Amino acid sequence: MTNSKEDADIEEKHMYNEPVTTLFHDVEASQTHHRRGSIPLKDEKSKELYPLRSFPTRVNGEDTFSMEDGIGDEDEGEVQNAEVKRELKQRHIGMIALGGTIGTGLFIGLSTPLTNAGPVGALISYLFMGSLAYSVTQSLGEMATFIPVTSSFTVFSQRFLSPAFGAANGYMYWFSWAITFALELSVVGQVIQFWTYKVPLAAWISIFWVIITIMNLFPVKYYGEFEFWVASIKVLAIIGFLIYCFCMVCGAGVTGPVGFRYWRNPGAWGPGIISKDKNEGRFLGWVSSLINAAFTFQGTELVGITAGEAANPRKSVPRAIKKVVFRILTFYIGSLLFIGLLVPYNDPKLTQSTSYVSTSPFIIAIENSGTKVLPHIFNAVILTTIISAANSNIYVGSRILFGLSKNKLAPKFLSRTTKGGVPYIAVFVTAAFGALAYMETSTGGDKVFEWLLNITGVAGFFAWLFISISHIRFMQALKYRGISRDELPFKAKLMPGLAYYAATFMTIIIIIQGFTAFAPKFNGVSFAAAYISIFLFLAVWILFQCIFRCRFIWKIGDVDIDSDRRDIEAIVWEDHEPKTFWDKFWNVVA
């Protein structure tokens, strides 16, 4: 493990019931107890496979390895209830990932890339980002099925890179979802204003803040069911929209056959941004649409977050990953293609400020085709989508905090759970950030809120970057141990090439995402808003690097690919094959 005598002494004390202090947990090794599932360590070589972070102890003269990270009850010898429940089925996992990605970024966010890059430029951007999303989910799938833990990829950053990287990645990712929750709350009222202005925006924020927080206190199986049905509504709405658009393009609307009319006039490429030179401006417009696409695709990694609460994760997670990414690509690319055919990039409605929903290219496409009732129906779909997204925000944020706490990177109380396996304190801490939504109702508060949103977007880029880097280290660790990737429950395709591909381009995107701050002249405020998240990440990393005083990156022999995995391998899962018509139907759909 470590070479110095001092580190060896620390390891020996840790292995044999000496008090051990970690960042947020003061743990005595004597507090861990032998329980079902503990693994006897018969020889010195086996001990070396388990790093210090896993709290081994001696019981009845034998070394045992506790899977509960030292959280135990001293009096009764039983582990305290500090675990989530594995109650998510495959159909839940697939729809949670779909629901987390298909949100306001699709229904409303497509207006910006369409305006700046035109229909073809935006289409190319989303295809390119789709390839990165595929690469990242393949990497995550291989790791999350081998070690299916809650808050998976933040845990992988800690185990495969270093505790400091794990903490920085985890806290930034959690902050991202907590702030996004506030965004969704602020948008709910604006969507309802499509119908009425009689109720103040602050009232809608308060109502949905309370409702969504309470929803996240129910056991995860209820969350899974809610997300399944809401995501089903979104999927059906998009499929219906694609069929509707196909009919409109072929001439069913008031405009007659549209075909590729708008690709000829005003054109397939947008006017561009910043530069007066036409070609240069169009290229910069395409780059801006690429960054917008990167923001929009964030959420495809949610399959990994659910791995710790998935029933039979070795089968359900790979199945979900194989289906989800292609469905997301189909919905995004298909929607963007038809929107580009029905809405010209210079349509003034794309940039109007009368209401938040009025800029949705979906609603504009319906209005341009002359269908009067559908805009109201689709606005209801958007409202449902936002409520679903806000629900996912708290779920993901709370599980990230739970994972940080379980891995000694956050206070111990954040890993407390209800009898139903809900980390309720982590839920309340994440939900508390919903108060920031009220900033949208105050003078000047919206500017501060915009800053916070910039931080959240780049935090998602860091998550994708570290998923790819962690997977590279994971593959190196497997090779070092002599484990063939062919033996894994799920083997990612085209690796390690795709992992390097995703890591390279995510690094480039993180660097260039604030390029508009430099042109046509440097803007200090815009620069700070775009890049403050990078400095925050570095600050958190430096803080935890100083606290842990660890290596910049683990030696390959110290990479932990064993903790939590052995418990899963000891379980015999029932594989429920679909038998009824509806079971088979949902198996295909979800």
Swiss-Prot record:
One GO molecular-function entry: amino acid transmembrane transporter activity
InterPro entries xrefs: AA-permease/SLC12A_dom, Amino_acid_permease_CS, Amino_acid_permease_fungi, APC_YAT
Effect annotated for changing P148L: In CAN1-337; confers citrulline transport activity in GAP1-deleted cells and leads to sensitivity to L-glutamic acid alpha-hydroxamate, alpha-aminoisobutyrate, 3-chloro-L-alanine, L-ethionine, L-allylglycine, and D-histidine, but not sensitivity to L-aspartic acid alpha-hydroxamate or p-fluoro-L-phenylalanine
PTM note: Phosphorylated probably at multiple sites.
Record annotation: effect of changing Y173D: In CAN1-306; confers citrulline transport activity in GAP1-deleted cells
Membrane-spanning ranges: 93-113, 117-137, 172-192, 199-219, 235-255, 283-303, 324-344, 377-397, 420-440, 449-469, 498-518, 524-544
Main location: membrane
GO cellular component, one term: endoplasmic reticulum
Result of altering G308A: In CAN1-341; confers citrulline transport activity in GAP1-deleted cells
Its membrane topology: Multi-pass membrane protein
Sequence positions bearing Phosphoserine: S54, S66
Effect of V149F: In CAN1-315; confers citrulline transport activity in GAP1-deleted cells
A Pfam family the protein falls into: AA_permease
Observed effect of gene inactivation: Resistance to canavanine. Extends replicative lifespan and leads to distinct changes in transcriptional and translational profiles, including translational activation of the GCN4 transcription factor.
Effect on the protein upon substituting W451L: In CAN1-316; confers citrulline transport activity in GAP1-deleted cells
Keywords, sorted A to Z: Amino-acid transport, Cell membrane, Endosome, Membrane, Phosphoprotein, Transmembrane, Transmembrane helix, Transport
Consequence the record notes for mutating W451S: In CAN1-335; confers citrulline transport activity in GAP1-deleted cells
GO terms under biological process: amino acid transmembrane transport; basic amino acid transport; L-arginine transmembrane transport; transmembrane transport
Location(s), subcellular: Cell membrane; Endosome membrane
Family membership noted in the UniProt record: Belongs to the amino acid-polyamine-organocation (APC) superfamily. YAT (TC 2.A.3.10) family.
Job description of the protein: High-affinity permease for arginine.
Self-association state and partner proteins as the record states: Interacts with RRT2.
PANTHER family listed in its UniProt record: AMINO ACID PERMEASE, ARGININE PERMEASE CAN1-RELATED
Name of the protein: Arginine permease CAN1
Gene designation: CAN1
